[in-house]
Amino acid sequence: MCSGKSTVGKLLADKLGYTFWDIDQLIEEREGKSIEEIFKDKGEEYFRSLEMKVLEEFLEKEKVVVSTGGGLGANPTAMEKMKSAGLVVWLDLDFDTFLRRCAHQEGRPLLKRGLDYLRALMEEREKVYRLAHIRLKADRPPDALVEGLLSQL
């Protein structure tokens, strides 16, 4: 959440000449609702199942950059599938930077659950994120993150 996955993903895809896909955006388009509305109307479990279905569509594709939501990247099954299909990058964001970036964003249902919940959620997700092939500190501008990533490819 709020690490810059979509922005960095688009920039990276442009640099590589690949196609960019944002799983959250695809889900919203297909459902005709925002993620917040999906959570409210059908629940988090339904949304997480949609994430996995959409991810499965990209596992066999080549020359794509895929941005996942933070919850999908924290799913151990999804992480293993992504790692076997391609390179997985973790944009690591410290909690204070996360709060600054997310403070004014609408449509993020998990942000409404309070600071203690968010801190615990980030700590729990990091256990799976650490399995990514590459870890980049996400406290720099998006173009600097892309250059840093390209230097590691």
What are these language model-derived features?
Residues 6:
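Walker A/P-loop
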Residues 11, 15, 61, 124-153:
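NTP-dependent small-molecule kinase module
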Residues 85-127:
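A glycine- and Lys/Arg-enriched "phosphate-lid" helix/loop adjacent to the NTP-binding pocket
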Residues 2:
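Walker A (P-loop) phosphate-binding loop of P-loop NTPases
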Residues 23-71, 75-83, 128:
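ATP-dependent small-molecule kinase phosphotransfer cores
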Residues 70-72, 94-96, 141:
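Short glycine-rich anion-binding loops that position phosphate/pyrophosphate groups of nucleotides
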